[in-house]
Design a protein with these regions (language model features):
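Ligand-binding pockets and gating/stacking loops
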Residues: 1-467
Length: 467
């Protein structure tokens, strides 16, 4: 991502002594100011946690994922059957064999509903936890914590779409970032950092400053101004001044290494790898919109989850991973029999690898993985071999984060259509995530944080069973 090049022998892995880096970081770089750029140290209101939100864009079926309903009629129950988990009496959809063996490390919610069945409205609602500003939870985190971690230079809020790890793939992956990374009423400077910004932006974000001029403020500022002009000319990135400051922070801390998957052990990359789960050619050929169907492919998901793990280790506070392709209406669109045989195993492999990886690194208590989508699917399979939009029940899973795992929360009715016990709301989702990220009592004492923001961040109620 961001590299500072030197023409002299390195004092450290970035090429400069700690004192030089501190001096550079202290330079007054005109025009780079932005509200709440840095997390404030010493107040203890930010917990040592990271949230990774895996968003199954398009709307995953509750039946084919975590609530198979095999006792229901054939037109309702999971098309691909069920698999026993390591929790007594709990079953997952037939494609989740690896995760079934880890159910004791998961908390599956079977009673989450919000009642919205429109893609854009539902996706933005879920990503925001239903908060009235419309800002996604990652942006809320960034608003309170600062857009850049002052201790390590990491972006506080990052979005990982397929193109972030598959930049050379010609297909257009069907990720819709604006639906899951919206800043709502907040300033756009609190938007997610997107490493897939496109074009030459990533290459342009390399400042060429010789070592003998590194302490020359005018030289450094000039280089940054050049970077800003390039960023301003790209429609992929807005609010360049704030991003530019973020880029300097990333630059000075060598954070770019966190985005480099080549640093990983090839055997670990293989454990995450989902490249084998491409959409079958036959499924593409019989569809009218072939490019759209190709874009449903989950071949990048393994790398996305691996990158998420690297960012967790590097200190990013909120990470959203987009997994497109879950809108399975059937006919000329994706059918369940087209989509689940590739999407299901891809999620099963990538997420199970992530859980094992996090555990092996001692990060289970620190990292909270949340798996959901904009809504669920209709109880009855339609005449086209698909399921339609259904906002009355939505898949929701939690893993880690120091919460209580190994349980199923809530219950749906016999048709898997409505909650019949313990209905969970988006406000509960918001409360659980904000409680994980912040000491909300201390957030209330922040003099520089507007009261309305404090109210929104603290408005949710954590899911009782998880705390």
């Amino acid at each position: 991502m961001l590299t500072l090049y030197s023409d002299k022998k390195a004092h450290n892995c970035q090429g400069y002594s700690r004192r030089e880096l501190l001096k550079i970081g202290a330079l007054s770089l005109g025009g780079l100011g932005s509200p709440q750029l840095f997390a404030q140290e010493g107040q203890g209101y930010i917990r040592d946690k990271t949230v990774v939100m895996l968003n199954m864009q398009g709307g995953p079926s509750q039946y084919e994922t975590f609530d198979p309903k095999m006792d229901a009629p054939s037109e309702i129950r999971s098309v691909f059957g069920e698999v026993k988990t390591n929790l007594p009496g709990v079953r997952f959809g037939g494609h989740f064999k690896r995760l079934a063996k880890m159910a004791d490390k998961m908390a599956v919610v079977r009673s989450y509903r919000h009642g919205i069945s429109d893609h854009a409205k539902a996706a933005m609602h879920v990503a925001a936890g239903g908060n009235p500003t419309g800002a996604c939870m990652g942006s809320l985190f960034s608003r309170v914590a600062g857009i850049t971690n002052s201790l390590n230079g990491m972006p506080a809020n990052t979005l990982i779409v397929p193109a972030a790890v598959e930049p050379d793939d010609a297909r257009k992956f069907n990720s819709v970032p604006t639906r899951i990374a919206n800043t709502g009423k907040l300033s756009s400077v609190y938007g997610a950092f997107d490493p897939s910004s496109g074009g030459d932006v990533l290459d342009d974000m390399k400042l060429q400053v010789p070592h003998d001029r590194i302490m020359d403020q005018l030289s450094l500022t000039s280089s940054l101004d050049t970077l800003k002009r390039k960023l301003d000319s790209s429609s992929a990135i807005h609010q360049a001044s704030a991003l530019q400051q973020q880029a300097v922070d990333v630059l000075m801390n060598g954070v770019g290494e966190a985005f480099n998957l080549s640093k990983e052990n090839p055997k670990l990359i293989e454990r995450y790898d989902t490249s084998q789960f491409d959409v079958p050619k036959a499924a593409v050929d019989r569809r009218k919109n072939k490019d759209a169907i190709r874009g449903h492919s989950p071949i990048s998901l393994g790398k996305q989850m691996l990158l998420a793990r690297r960012l967790c280790e590097a200190g990013c506070g909120f990470i959203t991973v987009s997994s497109p392709g879950w809108d399975m209406h059937g006919a000329h669109e994706f059918a369940i029999t087209d989509g689940m045989p590739v999407l299901g195993p891809a999620v099963d492999k990538a997420v199970s690898a992530f859980i094992e990886d996090i555990e092996s690194r001692g990060l289970t208590e620190k990292v909270l993985l949340v798996i959901t989508g904009e809504f669920g699917r209709t109880p009855k399979i339609n005449s086209k071999g698909g399921r339609d939009h259904w906002g009355n029940l939505c898949p929701l899973v939690f893993v880690g984060g120091g919460l209580k795992m190994g349980q199923v929360i809530g219950e749906s009715d016999k048709k898997g259509a409505e909650p019949i016990t313990n209905p969970i709301t988006s406000n509960d989702l918001l409360g659980t995530i904000m409680h994980s990220l912040f000491d909300l009592g201390k957030v209330r004492t922040l003099a520089n944080l507007p009261r309305d923001v404090q109210d929104v961040v603290g408005s949710g109620s954590p899911i009782t069973e998880l705390i």
